[in-house]
From Swiss-Prot:
One of the primary rRNA binding proteins, it binds directly to 16S rRNA where it nucleates assembly of the body of the 30S subunit. GO terms for biological process: ribosomal small subunit biogenesis; translation. Transmembrane segments: none annotated. One of its GO terms (molecular function) is rRNA binding. It comes from Azotobacter vinelandii (strain DJ / ATCC BAA-1303). The keyword rRNA-binding applies. This is Small ribosomal subunit protein uS4. InterPro entries: Ribosomal_uS4, Ribosomal_uS4_bac-type, Ribosomal_uS4_CS, Ribosomal_uS4_N, S4_RNA-bd, S4_RNA-bd_sf. Belongs to the universal ribosomal protein uS4 family. The gene is rpsD. GO terms for cellular component: small ribosomal subunit. Part of the 30S ribosomal subunit. Contacts protein S5. The interaction surface between S4 and S5 is involved in control of translational fidelity.
Length: 206
Protein backbone atom coordinates (compact mmCIF):
# COMPACT_ATOMS: atom_id res chain seq x y z
CA UNK A 1 0.00 0.00 0.00
CA UNK A 2 1.46 3.35 -1.08
CA UNK A 3 1.67 6.36 1.21
CA UNK A 4 -1.29 8.74 0.81
CA UNK A 5 -0.31 12.03 -0.87
CA UNK A 6 -3.76 13.55 -1.43
CA UNK A 7 -5.55 16.35 0.47
CA UNK A 8 -4.76 16.21 4.20
CA UNK A 9 -8.15 17.63 5.21
CA UNK A 10 -9.88 14.73 3.46
CA UNK A 11 -8.28 12.32 5.93
CA UNK A 12 -9.24 14.45 8.93
CA UNK A 13 -12.83 14.78 7.68
CA UNK A 14 -13.03 11.03 7.12
CA UNK A 15 -12.03 10.37 10.74
CA UNK A 16 -14.18 13.20 12.11
CA UNK A 17 -11.29 14.78 14.02
CA UNK A 18 -8.27 16.97 13.30
CA UNK A 19 -5.30 14.66 12.73
CA UNK A 20 -2.86 17.63 12.84
CA UNK A 21 -1.47 16.76 9.42
CA UNK A 22 -1.23 20.40 8.32
CA UNK A 23 0.99 23.19 9.56
CA UNK A 24 1.14 26.97 9.16
CA UNK A 25 0.02 30.12 10.94
CA UNK A 26 -3.26 28.48 11.92
CA UNK A 27 -1.57 25.47 13.50
CA UNK A 28 -3.24 26.00 16.88
CA UNK A 29 -6.75 25.66 15.46
CA UNK A 30 -8.37 23.12 13.19
CA UNK A 31 -7.77 23.97 9.54
CA UNK A 32 -10.28 21.42 8.28
CA UNK A 33 -14.06 21.15 8.46
CA UNK A 34 -14.08 17.92 10.43
CA UNK A 35 -17.77 18.06 11.26
CA UNK A 36 -18.73 16.56 7.89
CA UNK A 37 -17.37 13.57 6.02
CA UNK A 38 -15.56 14.08 2.68
CA UNK A 39 -17.46 14.04 -0.60
CA UNK A 40 -20.59 15.67 -2.02
CA UNK A 41 -22.76 14.01 0.63
CA UNK A 42 -20.36 14.78 3.43
CA UNK A 43 -23.07 15.96 5.81
CA UNK A 44 -24.44 12.42 5.97
CA UNK A 45 -22.17 10.61 8.40
CA UNK A 46 -23.72 7.20 8.78
CA UNK A 47 -23.85 5.13 11.95
CA UNK A 48 -20.94 2.71 12.16
CA UNK A 49 -21.09 -0.92 13.23
CA UNK A 50 -18.88 -2.16 16.06
CA UNK A 51 -16.35 -3.37 13.50
CA UNK A 52 -16.58 -0.08 11.63
CA UNK A 53 -15.89 1.88 14.80
CA UNK A 54 -12.85 -0.25 15.60
CA UNK A 55 -11.55 0.05 12.05
CA UNK A 56 -11.98 3.85 12.04
CA UNK A 57 -9.98 4.12 15.27
CA UNK A 58 -7.15 2.06 13.81
CA UNK A 59 -7.14 4.17 10.65
CA UNK A 60 -7.16 7.37 12.71
CA UNK A 61 -4.10 6.37 14.74
CA UNK A 62 -2.32 5.03 11.67
CA UNK A 63 -2.85 8.34 9.88
CA UNK A 64 -1.87 10.47 12.86
CA UNK A 65 1.53 8.77 12.97
CA UNK A 66 1.83 8.35 9.19
CA UNK A 67 2.32 4.59 9.33
CA UNK A 68 1.48 2.18 6.51
CA UNK A 69 -0.84 -0.79 7.09
CA UNK A 70 1.88 -3.45 7.14
CA UNK A 71 4.04 -1.35 9.48
CA UNK A 72 1.11 -0.80 11.82
CA UNK A 73 0.35 -4.52 11.93
CA UNK A 74 4.00 -5.15 12.79
CA UNK A 75 3.87 -2.64 15.62
CA UNK A 76 0.76 -4.34 17.00
CA UNK A 77 2.44 -7.75 16.95
CA UNK A 78 5.47 -6.35 18.77
CA UNK A 79 3.21 -4.59 21.30
CA UNK A 80 1.31 -7.81 22.01
CA UNK A 81 4.59 -9.65 22.73
CA UNK A 82 5.64 -7.13 25.36
CA UNK A 83 4.57 -7.17 28.99
CA UNK A 84 1.81 -4.84 30.09
CA UNK A 85 -1.06 -3.27 28.18
CA UNK A 86 -0.93 -4.06 24.47
CA UNK A 87 -2.69 -0.80 23.61
CA UNK A 88 -0.29 1.31 25.65
CA UNK A 89 2.69 -0.60 24.26
CA UNK A 90 1.44 0.14 20.74
CA UNK A 91 1.21 3.88 21.35
CA UNK A 92 4.65 3.92 22.95
CA UNK A 93 6.21 2.16 19.95
CA UNK A 94 4.66 4.79 17.69
CA UNK A 95 5.85 7.61 19.94
CA UNK A 96 9.43 6.27 19.83
CA UNK A 97 9.60 6.49 16.04
CA UNK A 98 12.30 8.95 15.01
CA UNK A 99 9.93 10.98 12.81
CA UNK A 100 7.58 11.39 15.77
CA UNK A 101 10.39 12.37 18.15
CA UNK A 102 11.66 14.97 15.66
CA UNK A 103 8.09 16.34 15.51
CA UNK A 104 7.70 16.31 19.31
CA UNK A 105 10.98 18.21 19.69
CA UNK A 106 9.65 20.85 17.32
CA UNK A 107 12.15 20.43 14.49
CA UNK A 108 9.34 19.60 12.05
CA UNK A 109 5.96 21.35 11.92
CA UNK A 110 4.26 18.04 11.14
CA UNK A 111 5.26 14.39 11.25
CA UNK A 112 5.34 14.37 7.44
CA UNK A 113 7.79 17.28 7.43
CA UNK A 114 9.85 15.49 10.08
CA UNK A 115 9.99 12.38 7.87
CA UNK A 116 11.25 14.53 5.04
CA UNK A 117 14.02 15.99 7.20
CA UNK A 118 15.09 12.48 8.15
CA UNK A 119 14.97 11.20 4.55
CA UNK A 120 17.09 14.17 3.46
CA UNK A 121 19.72 13.21 6.05
CA UNK A 122 19.23 16.36 8.12
CA UNK A 123 18.88 14.47 11.44
CA UNK A 124 21.45 12.79 13.67
CA UNK A 125 21.00 10.43 16.61
CA UNK A 126 23.90 10.41 19.05
CA UNK A 127 26.03 12.15 16.43
CA UNK A 128 25.31 9.65 13.64
CA UNK A 129 23.14 10.52 10.64
CA UNK A 130 19.96 8.43 10.54
CA UNK A 131 17.70 8.50 7.49
CA UNK A 132 15.14 5.92 8.60
CA UNK A 133 11.89 7.55 9.87
CA UNK A 134 10.83 4.36 11.69
CA UNK A 135 14.10 4.16 13.69
CA UNK A 136 13.23 3.47 17.34
CA UNK A 137 14.65 6.18 19.60
CA UNK A 138 15.78 5.03 23.05
CA UNK A 139 15.73 6.87 26.36
CA UNK A 140 18.81 9.08 26.60
CA UNK A 141 19.32 9.37 22.85
CA UNK A 142 20.36 12.81 21.57
CA UNK A 143 18.48 13.86 18.44
CA UNK A 144 19.82 16.89 16.56
CA UNK A 145 19.73 18.83 13.31
CA UNK A 146 22.87 18.41 11.20
CA UNK A 147 25.04 21.51 10.99
CA UNK A 148 24.37 22.04 7.28
CA UNK A 149 20.59 22.09 7.84
CA UNK A 150 20.38 24.24 10.99
CA UNK A 151 19.65 27.46 9.10
CA UNK A 152 16.64 26.14 7.19
CA UNK A 153 13.69 28.52 7.51
CA UNK A 154 11.17 25.71 7.95
CA UNK A 155 13.00 24.46 11.04
CA UNK A 156 12.89 27.92 12.63
CA UNK A 157 9.18 28.16 11.80
CA UNK A 158 8.52 24.70 13.23
CA UNK A 159 10.28 25.59 16.49
CA UNK A 160 8.15 28.73 16.74
CA UNK A 161 4.95 26.74 16.26
CA UNK A 162 6.08 24.19 18.85
CA UNK A 163 6.71 27.00 21.35
CA UNK A 164 3.14 28.20 20.78
CA UNK A 165 1.47 24.83 21.27
CA UNK A 166 3.81 23.71 24.08
CA UNK A 167 6.46 21.02 24.01
CA UNK A 168 5.83 17.63 25.58
CA UNK A 169 7.55 16.83 28.88
CA UNK A 170 9.36 13.67 27.77
CA UNK A 171 11.80 15.55 25.55
CA UNK A 172 14.29 18.28 26.45
CA UNK A 173 15.37 20.65 23.67
CA UNK A 174 18.10 23.24 23.28
CA UNK A 175 16.59 25.48 20.60
CA UNK A 176 19.85 27.36 20.07
CA UNK A 177 21.87 24.21 19.38
CA UNK A 178 18.86 22.59 17.70
CA UNK A 179 19.34 19.36 19.59
CA UNK A 180 17.27 17.48 22.12
CA UNK A 181 17.27 14.52 24.50
CA UNK A 182 14.58 11.84 24.57
CA UNK A 183 14.19 11.77 28.36
CA UNK A 184 11.59 9.04 28.79
CA UNK A 185 9.00 6.92 27.06
CA UNK A 186 5.65 8.68 27.60
CA UNK A 187 3.09 7.05 29.87
CA UNK A 188 -0.44 6.57 28.57
CA UNK A 189 -1.63 9.49 30.71
CA UNK A 190 0.79 11.76 28.82
CA UNK A 191 -0.78 11.02 25.44
CA UNK A 192 -3.96 12.15 23.73
CA UNK A 193 -7.24 11.16 25.36
CA UNK A 194 -8.84 11.32 21.88
CA UNK A 195 -7.31 7.95 21.05
CA UNK A 196 -9.09 4.79 22.19
CA UNK A 197 -6.43 2.13 21.74
CA UNK A 198 -8.71 -0.52 23.26
CA UNK A 199 -10.81 -0.44 20.08
CA UNK A 200 -7.68 -1.30 18.09
CA UNK A 201 -6.86 -4.20 20.41
CA UNK A 202 -10.44 -5.47 20.02
CA UNK A 203 -10.13 -5.24 16.23
CA UNK A 204 -6.92 -7.27 16.08
CA UNK A 205 -8.27 -9.77 18.61
CA UNK A 206 -11.10 -10.87 16.32
Amino acid sequence: MARYIGPKCKLSRREGTDLFLKSGSRALESKCNVESAPGIHGQRRGRLSEYGTQLREKQKVRRIYGVLERQFSGYYKEASRRKGSTGENLLQLLECRLDNVVYRMGFGATRAESRQLISHKAITVNGQTVNIPSYQVKVGDVVAIREKAKNQLRIAQALELCAQRGRVEWVEVDTEKKSGVFKSVPARSDLSADINENLIVELYSK
